[in-house]
A protein has these predicted regions:
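Conserved ABC transporter NBD signature motif
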Residues: 56-67
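Helix-to-loop junction immediately C-terminal to a conserved catalytic motif
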Residues: 48
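Conserved ABC ATPase "signature" region
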Residues: 100, 113-130
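Conserved ABC ATPase signature
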Residues: 134-138
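Q-loop/switch helix immediately C-terminal to the Walker
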Residues: 86, 91-105
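Catalytic Walker B motif of ABC-type/P-loop ATPase nucleotide-binding domains
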Residues: 159-163
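ABC ATPase NBD coupling module
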Residues: 65-81
Length: 231
């Protein structure tokens, strides 16, 4: 369980938001929708333990990320996967290089296993045979899906995705819908940050919880009772 209490952020002499409370249950898929410049990326960095809030605190399984044990906070950050909205990498890198880096960050995966898993993950996101491609030559959609697949190689317990649904594009929405819900069913906590939620996703998720400038949706997972599930 990730809980945030009375979160506040002050920027450029003004209050971006203050007094916000969040609760994200384990093994679930969540989507936080908010308008441009509302602080979605900043919120994810606070929840990951990367940026201390100006007010409030974040608790993981009842333990404070910012006022508690530093070792716990480091372990938490190591357990998190993160797909950023803006991806800046060496133009010379290939997709395989990206997976190699992910394997090292995940405490090491044998080369043969890494390649097999990378092939499967790329196939899952609609990019079979992409290991040799140069990242600089990928489209916006291909890049979003590639970085997502590379983070999944690590097997993170918590996956934060910033703008991945929008970046991947409309043709990939149903694939991502199934993937994120399957990850949640397998025990991964998925937290997505987007400007808007796809209409079919919103219909299936039901009423959102308003929190400051954000609306928080819990996506239904396979095996649970759902309404209006996208077809």
């Amino acid at each position: 369980m990730i809980e945030a209490f009375r979160l506040g952020v002050f920027s450029r002499g003004a209050t971006l938001w203050d007094g916000l409370d969040f609760a994200f249950g384990d093994a679930a898929a969540w989507l936080v929708a908010g308008p441009p410049s509302s602080g979605k990326t900043l919120l994810l960095s606070i929840l990951r333990g990367e940026r201390r809030p100006d007010a409030g605190d974040v608790l993981v399984s009842g333990e404070s990320l910012y006022r508690g044990n530093a070792a716990l906070a480091r372990a938490w950050r190591a357990s998190c996967g993160h797909v950023p909205e803006q991806t800046i990498v060496d133009a010379r890198l290939t997709v395989e290089d990206l997976f190699r880096r992910s394997a090292l960050a995940g405490c090491g995966v044998r080369e043969r296993e890494r390649k097999d898993r990378a092939d499967r993950l790329l196939g899952m996101v609609g990019l079979p045979g992409a290991l040799g491609w140069r990242i600089a030559e990928l489209s916006i959609s291909e890049r979003a899906r590639t970085f997502l697949a590379a983070e999944l190689l690590r097997g993170p317990k918590i996956l934060f995705c910033d703008g991945v649904v929008a970046g991947a594009g409309i043709p990939c929405r149903e694939m991502l819908w199934g993937l994120f819900r399957a990850l949640a069913r397998a025990g991964t906590t998925v937290i997505l940050a987007e400007r808007t939620i796809p209409e079919r996703w919103a219909s299936a998720a039901g009423d959102a919880e308003p929190v400051g400038p954000f609306r928080v949706y819990r996506l239904p997972v396979p095996g649970a009772a759902v309404k209006g599930e996208p077809g």
